Amino acid sequence: MVVRLTSTRDSRMGEDKVSIQSSAYPLAFRVDPSELKLEPLPLVDGITRVRSYARTLEGMQKEAVIQYGPTAAIWRVVSDEGPWLNGTDLAPFPLAFFTAGMAASLISDFVDEAGDRGVQIDSLEFTQDNFFTMQGSALKGTMAASVQPMQVKISARGKDAAEDYLRVAESAVHERSAANRCLREDLASRFAVRANDHDLAWPGLAADAVSALTDPASVFDNIRPMSGGDTTLIRKTDTVAEATGDAVGLVADQKRVVHVNNQGSIRKDGLISLDVGCIHPPGSCFRMLSDGEDVVGSQERAPSGLVYLSAGIAFCFMTQIGRYAQITKQSLNGYRIIQDTAFRLSQNHDPQAFAVETLVCLDTDEPDDRSIQIVRMAEQTCYIHAAYRTATRTEVTLA
């Protein structure tokens, strides 16, 4: 019998009773779209849109439904946190989704670029390291996330010379990759905020693409896996020991670095295998499978890199909402978001990433100004929103 992820109370106010461990569903699966009736996301002007509907579950757990516009594929994934945030460590942490999604996209871009150049790939190993920092005081409002340049190391074997593979790698990352553009450009995020079904005045850039959408609470009541999805898309491969003392992520004053590592390769069946884990602070490792980005040609047996990447943004931002509210002891009974990410995929070396647009729906007893402050601080302390608004250049080397 399949246990559905639903609550015995109102779906907006009872999210604390829903958990990953109470469900028989896998950590990731493709969703049967017949009962969801989501608004289509057509491909306009060559722009690929990815829409994420996300909600909180028990503790630090979260659930997201990700809609990939060009093919209308819908995926459901869940996220958790490790001991650094008193999580239950049952699913990948948010930065794992972002890191794995970036890696999957870059691997696909490398393979496509090699094909265009006639460079043969007999084997491929891909190493990626992402570094994020958190510094400041949550109580004083000075806490902020920042990002360091991503490091990519590629080991490719074939009949061609090493310099050919290096040229392919540099071109794939710096000239072909739409995913990497979200790190390369300075993209300020846009928001709309709704508290208890009441629209609030957001002082920053407006999220016009999502501001008029309906609270996504009911989306999660009609999720069913598509038949035939027997492949385990996400699983834990290594478990970190339980932390001792206070959870470092819940300390009011912080100065720390987060290091996430990914090891990627291509399986014989063509799926991309991604082993991602948190190096500092020490965390568990998860294996995530991904299929190609191509609108034409991909079998969509697993989420694409852009799906995982978009899920990571949503999960990380939601973690910061809950973390800030917990540290500052603000009343927050539940929260959900609808997030749009957009990319222009291109074979002509002119890709593009667009600013993230997010509708935030809060269930709270706090006044309007504090609700706005929760969202403002969540953006300020979100590692991935920091990556979007900070232009960095990815470092590429050949092993």
Language-model segments: residues:
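Alpha-helical metal-binding/catalytic segments enriched in His/Glu/Asp
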Residues: 102-106, 316-317
